[in-house]
């Protein structure tokens, strides 16, 4: 089965409002108790059971690192997917685009440019700039089009009556959208771990890349098997360990050019010596900025922006 195929994945259980919609990994009977997963886990979510290692689902941050280090493939993600609202069901009178705090920091002009594209199709869509960690203050039944995987997860689960769909599913559905021609460009794709359980997002992104004549060389850990770039380790382990994990992830990607759709991943790939290509930049035929912020600088700026929005 392809890592971006959803034909054999099971829809996840209904979301419980107020509880962040997180998934986890588990250890199968193939475990040989080597302990590699426990050493790599940034949050100490894995412990030795009676016959094999076990994952505490409440502690697990769903980064996927255990799956990348397990020599037997015994550490696996839960086999569930989370559906998006059908684009055909979008109510334009209650439709919003949230660019996410990180995009707004990275290139403040991008949200308005993307809004222009969306307004050509959805005339009544509104820009929504409230951080996903705060009450969105929009009507029950509204839908937020999200760029950020974390925003998608939090908006759909922490707040009553909010539907979500990724920007990439929506943009891919715009049949008359003119896209730049990037013929000759070969890339790997680093899929955001927050979208791991949405293969429809992975499919939309590959479709957009194909429309731009970009060749994709997939890595073993992509799509529903993608693992965190390492940035989510920040705050759990020393920065040196975060940077080690970032380098580990970069090595897994066959191409030096890496398509990403998360700003934290842009910074991570720059640090690891890859050339990140931020998907909004590709679609708009713009150059991706090679972010030089340290881990602390990036997270300080992001934290301040979150507090203010």
Give the predicted meaning of each segment.
Residues 3-12, 22-25, 77-309:
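Iron-sulfur cluster-binding electron-transfer modules in prokaryotic oxidoreductases
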Residues 11-33, 44-62, 75, 82-85, ...:
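Ferredoxin-like iron-sulfur electron-transfer modules
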Residues 28, 38, 57, 67, ...:
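Short glycine-/small-residue-rich flexible loop motifs, especially phosphate/cofactor-binding loops
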Residues 36-46, 123, 210, 214:
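Generic secondary-structure signature for well-ordered alpha-helical cores
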Residues 69-76:
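Short metal-binding segments enriched for Cys and/or His
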């Amino acid at each position: 089965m392809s890592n971006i195929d959803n034909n054999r994945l099971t829809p996840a259980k209904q979301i419980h409002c107020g509880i962040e919609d997180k998934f986890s990994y588990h250890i199968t009977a193939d475990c040989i108790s080597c302990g590699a997963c426990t050493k790599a886990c940034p949050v100490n979510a894995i412990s030795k059971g009676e016959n094999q290692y076990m994952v505490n689902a409440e502690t697990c941050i769903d980064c996927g690192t255990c799956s990348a280090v397990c020599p037997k493939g015994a550490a696996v993600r839960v086999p569930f997917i989370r559906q998006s609202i059908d684009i055909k069901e979008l109510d334009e009178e209650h439709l919003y685009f949230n660019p996410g705090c990180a995009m707004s920091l990275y290139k403040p002009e991008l949200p308005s440019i993307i809004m222009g594209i969306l307004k050509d199709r959805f005339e009544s869509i509104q820009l929504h700039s409230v951080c996903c960690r705060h009450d969105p203050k929009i009507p029950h039944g509204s839908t937020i089009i999200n760029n950020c995987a974390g925003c998608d997860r939090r908006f759909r689960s922490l707040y009553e009556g909010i539907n979500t769909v990724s920007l990439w599913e929506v943009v891919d559905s715009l049949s008359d959208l003119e896209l730049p021609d990037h013929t000759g460009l070969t890339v790997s794709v680093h899929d955001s771990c927050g979208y791991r359980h949405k293969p429809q997002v992975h499919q939309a992104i590959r479709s957009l890349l194909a429309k731009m004549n970009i060749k994709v060389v997939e890595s073993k850990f992509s799509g529903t098997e993608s693992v965190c770039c390492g940035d989510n380790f920040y705050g759990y382990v020393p920065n040196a360990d975060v940077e080690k994990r970032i380098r580990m992830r970069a090595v897994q990607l066959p191409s030096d050019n890496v398509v990403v759709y998360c700003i934290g991943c842009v910074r991570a790939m720059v640090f690891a010596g890859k050339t990140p290509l931020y998907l909004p930049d590709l679609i708009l035929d713009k150059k991706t900025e090679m972010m030089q912020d340290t881990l602390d600088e990036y997270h300080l700026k992001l934290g301040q922006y979150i507090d203010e929005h």
